[in-house]
Regions:
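TRNA-recognition modules of translation machinery and tRNA-sensing kinases, especially anticodon-binding
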Residues: 27, 135-434
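N-terminal alpha-helical targeting/anchoring segments
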Residues: 1-140, 154, 158
Length: 434
């Protein structure tokens, strides 16, 4: 969400940014919101003048009423002024109603206008234009056939998709035995990994109010992703970054408290509307999963430094699990409206012989802070908006796919990397049961 003053003073820049994001249908919104803003400011000015006039006229009436004790003709003059005050009061009520209507319309439009992207963002309409930046680790190409990930899990009696389908429908799963333990081990390792980086571990609310969601994501994304609790102003979270950032809603943070660095575990719930291909079946794209997430609230001048640190930590974590990865810079058309800059970390799939997304790191500038009314009080006493960032530490369903494929041996066993062994009871290898 942009600052109205910034938009008013830079309409062409805002329009050019909309074009870069291939959202030309939003171009008329810029002129529309500027016109509404002008009308609103005119109404505010007139209302302010009427309030000042009311105060002056009220004093005048008081003087005339006092003078009327000696000069009754002053009563008639006072009554005329009272009539003017009444007319002004009626007009003031109209203006206050207009202001409310204008502000609601302005707010609604401002939520639709995308944030200004960073100059370094590549321009393109969709994720096909995302740019590979760097690879980390040599992609593995084994000399044996790697089964589909659910087949690997089934060889350990580790997954039951059929039972989950009967109980909950498509997009759910039961994890069992060593696979369930591996799932929890990855989460525990990721938690400790981030604590070692200086982050505060957090278990946040798993349901949040609608106004918090409006503050952290676009309405379109919200409608496509979120499950609403019927009859309640509550939504199941699609990612814990939303409830972690929401922790600071309406707060004034002392500058000395920055940066705020939180890492959280949570279940996540997503509608995942739309049809997907065979490679998005199994546990790749599902309605319920667990995730370790990180967020940072920081000074504006520090946000790009944090951005680079955060995605590099994702690379470090995956490499410690013997998973080759690459960094992809997201193009303009692939950025959600609140994002200034974003990159995906993709893991290597030896079975598909290609990379697939496992993490997403984003700098949202001051967009979330503006929507959520999060402010910082500087050492000089001045208020400003902080920047917010988020990054997936690990989402085990997709992580498990990458982990199993990259650590699978020809005999069907799976090697456990050294860093994960303490979380697996000292096991160095998982042996299939089938």
């Amino acid at each position: 969400m942009l600052d109205m003053k910034f938009l008013r003073e830079n309409p062409e820049l805002v329009k050019e940014n909309i074009k870069k994001k291939f959202q030309d249908e939003k171009l008329p919104l810029v002129d529309e919101v500027i016109a509404l803003d002008a009308a609103n400011r005119a109404a505010i000015t007139e209302a302010s003048e009427l309030r000042a006039s009311r105060n002056a006229l009220s004093k005048q009436i008081g003087m005339l009423m006092g003078q009327a004790k000696k000069d009754p003709s002053k009563l008639e003059e006072a009554e005329k002024i009272k009539a003017t005050v009444k007319a002004n009061a009626d007009r003031l009520a109209e203006l206050e109603k207009l202001e409310e209507e204008y502000e609601q319309k302005i707010h609604k439009i401002m939520l639709l206008i995308p944030n200004i992207i960073d100059p370094s963002v590549p321009i393109g309409p969709d994720d096909s234009c995302n740019v590979e930046v760097e690879r980390f680790g040599e992609p593995k190409v084994p000399d044996f056939e790697i089964p589909y990930h659910t087949q690997i899990m089934e060889s350990f009696d580790g997954v039951d998709m059929d039972a989950a389908g009967r109980v909950s429908g498509a997009g759910f799963y039961y994890l069992l035995g060593d696979i369930a333990r591996l799932h929890e081990a990855v989460l525990a390792y990721a938690r400790d990994f981030m604590i070692d980086k200086g982050f505060t571990f957090c278990i946040p609310p798993f349901m949040i109010h609608g106004n918090v969601y409006e503050g952290v994501m676009s309405q379109n994304d919200m409608d496509a992703m979120m499950y609403k609790i019927e009859g309640e102003d509550l939504y199941l979270i699609g990612t814990s970054e939303h409830s972690m950032v929401g922790r600071f809603i309406g707060e004034i943070l002392p500058e000395s408290s920055l940066p705020q660095t939180l890492t959280s575990y949570s279940p996540c719930f997503r509608k995942e509307k739309g049809s997907h291909g065979i490679e998005e079946r199994g546990v790749y794209r599902i309605h319920q999963f667990e995730k370790q997430e990180m967020i940072v609230v920081c000074k504006p001048e520090d946000s790009m430094d944090w951005y680079n640190r955060m995605w590099k930590w994702s690379v470090e974590l995956f490499r410690s699990l013997d998973i080759p990865v690459r960094q992809l810079e997201c193009c303009s058309g692939d950025l959600a409206d609140l994002k200034v800059k974003s990159c995906d970390i993709e893991a290597w799939s030896p079975r598909q012989k290609k990379y697939f997304e496992v993490c997403s790191c984003s700098n949202l500038g001051d967009a979330q802070a503006r929507r959520l009314k999060i402010r910082v009080k500087g050492e000089d006493g001045k208020m400003y908006l902080p920047h917010t960032l988020n990054n997936t530490v690990v989402a085990p369903p997709r992580m498990l796919i990458a982990f199993l494929e990259n650590n699978l041996q020809a005999d069907g066993s799976v090697l456990i990397p050294k860093v994960l062994q303490p979380y697996m009871g000292g096991k160095t290898v998982l042996t299939p049961k089938k």
